[in-house]
A protein has these predicted regions:
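Short intrinsically disordered terminal tails
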Residues: 1, 102-105
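Histidine-centered nuclease catalytic patch
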Residues: 41-77
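Short Cys/His-centered divalent metal-binding micro-motifs
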Residues: 44-45, 76-102
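Short, charged surface segments at domain edges that flank catalytic/cofactor-binding sites
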Residues: 1-41
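Short linear functional motifs in flexible/disordered or boundary regions
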Residues: 29, 48-51, 93-96
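Acidic, low-complexity intrinsically disordered regions
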Residues: 33, 70, 100-101
């Protein structure tokens, strides 16, 4: 596998994704789509990307270290807080596995 590459195309995609998140945050009807996918908290889009713990940072659902071919894949992008993204690192997030069943089951 190859390492993450910081290409012009990736920088442009990162900026476009940030702008889309900021536009969604400005629209109360669609704000939920701009929240941090890891903690569901509101992201501070008024500051530069990655400048504070509460600022926006593009996160990859499937970490680039696990599948570099998805680095520039829009469907692999998620809005996150810088802090949440850094805490997660390159681990795959634990998702909900479905409906809960009774403890006696």
């Amino acid at each position: 596998m190859t390492a993450r590459q910081n290409t012009r195309r990736m920088n442009r995609l990162r900026q476009e994704f940030f702008e889309e998140g900021r536009a969604l945050d400005a629209d109360p009807a669609r704000r939920k789509e701009s929240l941090c996918w890891l903690c569901a908290g509101r992201i501070d889009y008024s500051v530069g990307q990655g400048t504070t713990d509460e600022s926006h940072e593009l996160d990859h659902v499937v970490p680039v270290s696990k599948d570099p071919s998805l680095q520039e894949e829009w469907s692999n992008f998620r809005n996150s807080h810088r802090r949440c993204n850094r805490e997660r690192g390159d681990r795959t997030p634990l998702g909900d596995t479905g409906d809960r069943v009774a403890a006696w089951w």
